[in-house]
C-alpha cells in the first residue's frame, strides 16, 4: 500500500485467488476464491478494510486450468503453459533451509535432538530443517514411529515424541489483524467469543472453533475437536463461511 500511495495509484491488482465484495454500508469483505483448489485467501488475512478498498483480484471468478491459461494463450503470454509451483514460488529448487542459509550468509548450526524424557538421542544439522509433526528424515533410528514435537530455536534443539504428544485442544496467537470491520469483531469478541472455521495450515479444511481473547491479551482459539501438529510461527486464519474474518501468528498449542 505504501508503494501504491507513492506511485499515486488508486488500486493494486494481484493474481491471488481470492475475491472481495462491498456491503451496503460500505464495508468490505474478503472471500475465498471461486476455485477451492486454488483459493489463497489464507495468505491475505492481513488485508484490513483500508487495504481491501484499494485491492483488485482479477482472477477471483476464473478457473486457472481453463479460463486463465486460455486467456494467457490468447494474449500470447509465453508462460501460458508453464507448470505451476506448489510451494514457495521464488525458491525454485524447494530447498528452503538452503535459501535461509544463503540469505543469512552462514550455515545453520548443528545441535541436539532430544527425546520427550529429556535425553539426547541424536544430533541435527540445523533446527530450521525440522517442523512440528515431521516423521521422516529425522536422522534418528528408533524402534517405533516418532515425531518432531517442538523446535527450540533459542537453544537450537529439536524435540521428539509420540503421536499423542502432537495433540492439542487450543492454540494461542498474537499479531492479530482483522480483515472484517475491526470494531464489529471486537464487539463480538467481548460478548462471549466468536464461532469460526479456523485453519492453521494452508491446505487444511476449516476446523470448528471458538475465538476469544486470553487473559494475557493473546487470541485464544479453542477447537471443538482435538487438533494435531499445531506449529508456532504458522499463520492461523479464521473464517465465517467463505468470508475471512482475520488472523494472526500461532504462538503455542494448549493441551
Model-found features: residue ranges?
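Nucleotide-activated chemistry modules centered on ATP-dependent adenylation/adenylyltransferase
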Residues: 1-244, 249-255
Amino acid at each position: 500500500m505504501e508503494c501504491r500511495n507513492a506511485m499515486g495509484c488508486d488500486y493494486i491488482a494481484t493474481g491471488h485467488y481470492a475475491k472481495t465484495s462491498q456491503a451496503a454500508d460500505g464495508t468490505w469483505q474478503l472471500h475465498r476464491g471461486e476455485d477451492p483448489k486454488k483459493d489463497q485467501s489464507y495468505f491475505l488475512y492481513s488485508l484490513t478494510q483500508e487495504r481491501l478498498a484499494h485491492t483488485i483480484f482479477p482472477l477471483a471468478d476464473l478457473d486457472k486450468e481453463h479460463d486463465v491459461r486460455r486467456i494467457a494463450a490468447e494474449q500470447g503470454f509465453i508462460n501460458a503453459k508453464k507448470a505451476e509451483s506448489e510451494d514457495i514460488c521464488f525458491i525454485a529448487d524447494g530447498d528452503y533451509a538452503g535459501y535461509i542459509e544463503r540469505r543469512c550468509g552462514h550455515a545453520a548450526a548443528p545441535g541436539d535432538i532430544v527425546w520427550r524424557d529429556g535425553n539426547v538421542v541424536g544430533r541435527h544439522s540445523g533446527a530450521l530443517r525440522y517442523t512440528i509433526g515431521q516423521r521422516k528424515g529425522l536422522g534418528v533410528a528408533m524402534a517405533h514411529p516418532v515425531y518432531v514435537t517442538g523446535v527450540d530455536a533459542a537453544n537450537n534443539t529439536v524435540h521428539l515424541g509420540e503421536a499423542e504428544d502432537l495433540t492439542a485442544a487450543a492454540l494461542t496467537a498474537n499479531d492479530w489483524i482483522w480483515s472484517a470491520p475491526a470494531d464489529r469483531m471486537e464487539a463480538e469478541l467481548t460478548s462471549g467469543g466468536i464461532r469460526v472455521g479456523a485453519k492453521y495450515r494452508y491446505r487444511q479444511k476449516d476446523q470448528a472453533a471458538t475465538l476469544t481473547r486470553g487473559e494475557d491479551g493473546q487470541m485464544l482459539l479453542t477447537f471443538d475437536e482435538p487438533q494435531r501438529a499445531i506449529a508456532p510461527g504458522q499463520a492461523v486464519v479464521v473464517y465465517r463461511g467463505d468470508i475471512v474474518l482475520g488472523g494472526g501468528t500461532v504462538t503455542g498449542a494448549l493441551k
